[in-house]
């Protein structure tokens, strides 16, 4: 059966502009199924026996870019150092497997860590592969560790997952711990702006979102959230925060998780996803809407969007509902590219203005006796003068 004019139009748009998905948990499926050993597993990576993602279906879906989630679960004992350090260790393992996956399949995937590299990957016919982490429990309470993750290619950090942490409150946990952001969290927003890391507000409490939206100098994203007015779920974005997101110039990337789309989750469909996109676009402008599936973070996608091969159906559905080509292109990927460009610009401005980095608060390393010995030795050498 030949494609309809709308389907042909959708395919054309997908070849003109990268459709960039804000969140996919395929790396965690690799951890669960292969224990991260992908040596000799190319056949399975092309056609996975589980989940909504594999290389074959990515190509069929004409995906232009993907933020792969280096997700690890919240520690069972978050207040204990061993749990915090284990989360950081697992995060490094997930970053490693993402990089190995990209390196192993260079004809399909290409690493990207900037707006410019998204375009170069797309023009080369590859899926631009970016990385995000899903919760500040993954940094072992260390801003130094977070900066190193940025150097390893991480370009967004979700402030929380389904647990409170030292920086922010989560959406689905009660009672609240900080009333939104902690003081450390407020300082971290500034540091994330300075280092050029996108701030992701998915999974955070409504109060944390409000505070971060007011504090951040750079646009923020919701990498995988939907609209509270259409589905009253703690993970979704309220109209009040949508208004602040508009002022912030950020993007809400609509999630495909059934529970976030419809009160009767088992009845969620492609049409519900389009409803959420159109609501946000009508409310705050299509310049502030994107796509963040959360594929492989769910057991089953909505009807009509069952896996990563279905992006053409989503684009066609938006066109059928009367969304203009220009607005569809914005939703597909131009908006999140613009946010990344602005995040990069703000970071360059802050660093250029001499903004100092936020440092970890370390325990005392030396006692006063050792400091005095070191000082005396330095003074002794000074008194000796230049040596021939």
UniProtKB/Swiss-Prot annotation:
Example GO BP: proteolysis
Cofactor: Zn(2+)
Reactions catalysed, as given in the entry: an L-aminoacyl-L-amino acid + H2O = 2 an L-alpha-amino acid
SS bonds (residue pairs): 74-163
This enzyme's EC code(s): 3.4.13.19
PROSITE patterns, per database record: RENAL_DIPEPTIDASE_2 (PS51365)
Record GO terms (molecular function): metal ion binding; metallodipeptidase activity
Protein name: Dipeptidase gliJ
Gene: gliJ
